Amino acid sequence: MDSEFFQPVYPRHYGECLSPVSTPSFFSTHMYTILIAIVVLVIIIIVLIYLFSSRKKKAAAAIEEEDIQFINPYQDQQWVEVTPQPGTSKPAGATTASVGKPVTGRPATNRPVTDRPATNNPVTDRLVMATGGPAAASAAASAAASAAASAPAHPAEPYTTVTTQNTASQTMSAIENLRQRSTYTHKDLENSL
């Protein structure tokens, strides 16, 4: 047997046929998937930024609105000297405050007992007290009687504040009415002073 019959026959470009086929890159095969994912991420980021900015605007508006509304006047008000009005009882442990100290133990109500109906409007309370309406006369009489009977000697104006020149009874009744409400406006504060 001749060995030349068993020689393999190679095609001309056999080396080129055996070279590995170049596989496409990851980006070229998944190009559309990657682009869609990037677009979705950008949309999500834009939506989140919009939501957080609107929340910040709402929070800023709420804080600004809270700055306009006044809190309980007793929280920040500094009184020169506080003594209970005639006709009210001092609770146990209540002390008189001095300058620089907030009022801590105040009576449940600063208004003397009267026969007039209680109103929550500081404007009408102030008008009734200023004009000396029928309820104001009986209130003055009952206050004088109870002051002579049970109260020790007090200064002429027991409720003097650092910031106002109004009489004590007008200021305290208006502030007491404001204290019973939850929100206040500039007009309410002006009416109480």
Swiss-Prot record:
Induction statement: Expressed in the late phase of the viral replicative cycle.
Region span, Disordered: 84-126
Function: Inner envelope protein involved, through its interaction with host dynein, in the intracellular microtubule-dependent transport of viral capsid toward viral factories. Seems to induce caspase-3 activation and apoptosis. Plays a role in virion morphogenesis by recruiting and transforming the host ER membranes into the precursors of the viral envelope. Involved in virus attachment to the host cell.
Subunit structure: Interacts with the host light chain cytoplasmic dynein DYNLL1; this interaction is critical for intracellular microtubule-dependent virus transport toward viral factories.
Keyword set, alphabetical order: Apoptosis, Cytoplasmic inwards viral transport, Host cytoplasm, Host cytoskeleton, Host endoplasmic reticulum, Host membrane, Host-virus interaction, Late protein, Membrane, Microtubular inwards viral transport, Repeat, Transmembrane, Transmembrane helix, Viral envelope protein, Virion, Virus entry into host cell
Protein localization: Virion membrane; Host cytoplasm, Host cytoskeleton; Host endoplasmic reticulum membrane
Membrane topology: Single-pass membrane protein
Transmembrane segments: 32-52
Protein family membership: Belongs to the asfivirus envelope protein p54 family.
Name of the protein described by the UniProt record: Inner membrane protein p54
Gene Ontology biological-process annotations: microtubule-dependent intracellular transport of viral material towards nucleus; symbiont entry into host cell
A single Gene Ontology CC term: virion membrane
